[in-house]
Regions:
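Alpha/beta-hydrolase superfamily serine-hydrolase fold, recognizing
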Residues: 1-309
Length: 309
């Protein structure tokens, strides 16, 4: 059915987060120039190395470089996977956040992926894989040092980031999937306010992402499990991870589940909680560049990446 997501209680927190992101646009172009130089990259004329059916017209990305752009230098690269409940959001909403990260010495890739409900699972995770393959194959012209490749995501973007890494790090399981995957693992990741065990939620928020209009599932049971219970597929090959949640966020327990699973497998990681003394630090608070805790979190995450250079 057609839903007005802003009126659906289950999606209210997503909408509040999205409105917070949209407010960043008011910061203006001067702020953007202060943080970094923007390189806008569109789909090239010669797209012979792309699957034109998969690389849709909205599959565009921006790269944000440090202000001191040196054409002879390749930069450590962060791929940022935006949130929005798998149904909302785009790269424009994350532009100032990505500029901020670029100011810390990274080239930051900010991209669109196909959204639900028009595009069912695994469309979004396919697009993550296509994007990473593309920047890897074109790293030279894009001034990206893929030996220093990192990923981060928030909310649904954290789920997609974890999902990508689980698939990329498990060749045996990857061979069983019937959608596009890629095997390039980042050296480290940051997962912010994510959802990782959807089968532990009491609502059916994932149905509109997984089901077709007739009520049947769009993918096989095995592939549904990869989305709904992805921590079952986690292995020790998962990259070092910085995990973050807010105590004021209903999704906080999802990060605790992930922490417990990583601890059991011996995956190198840290977990950080925020918001104990700041009730305004809620879901994806770190995107708000006016929030001191958000700035602190972003500083810690950039330091987490830099230690793996």
């Amino acid at each position: 059915k057609n839903l007005d997501y802003k009126k659906e209680p289950d999606h209210q927190k997503w909408c509040e987060a999205v409105e917070l992101l949209a407010s960043q646009r008011t910061m203006g172009e001067k702020t953007s120039e202060k943080y970094s130089r923007i390189f806008y990259y569109n789909e090239p004329d010669d797209a012979s190395n792309l699957d034109s059916e998969r690389y849709a017209s909205n599959s565009l990305f921006d790269i944000y470089y440090p202000v001191e752009l040196d054409a002879q230098t390749s930069y450590p690269v962060i791929v940022s996977v935006h949130g929005g409940g798998w149904f909302y959001g785009d790269k424009e909403l994350y532009s100032y956040y990505c500029c901020h990260l670029a100011s810390k010495g990274f080239a930051v890739v900010n991209f669109n992926y196909r959204l639900a409900p028009q595009n069912k699972y695994p469309a979004a995770i396919e697009d993550v894989a296509y994007l990473i393959r593309y920047i890897h194959e074109n790293a030279g012209v894009l001034h990206l040092d893929m030996e220093k490749f990192y990923m981060l995501g928030d909310s649904a973007g954290a789920q997609l980031t974890a999902n990508y890494c689980i698939i990329a790090g498990n060749a045996a399981y990857r061979s069983k999937l019937d959608f596009f995957t890629y095997d390039r693992l980042p050296k480290a990741v940051c997962l912010n306010c994510g959802a990782y065990e959807m089968d532990k939620r009491e609502d059916n928020i994932s149905d509109w992402y997984m089901k077709k209009e007739d009520g049947s599932y769009a993918v096989s049971e095995e592939q549904r499990k990869l989305f709904l219970s992805q921590l079952e597929y986690l292995t020790k090959d998962f990259p070092p991870a910085y995990l973050m949640y807010s105590v004021n966020d209903d999704l906080r327990f999802q990060t605790i589940y992930l922490d417990e699973r990583m601890e059991k497998l011996g995956i190198r990681h840290v977990i950080r909680s925020f918001g104990e003394e700041h009730p305004d630090s809620g879901h994806v608070f770190h995107i708000n560049l006016k929030n001191p805790e958000g700035i602190q979190c972003n500083e810690e995450e950039c330091a987490w990446f830099h230690q793996y250079e």
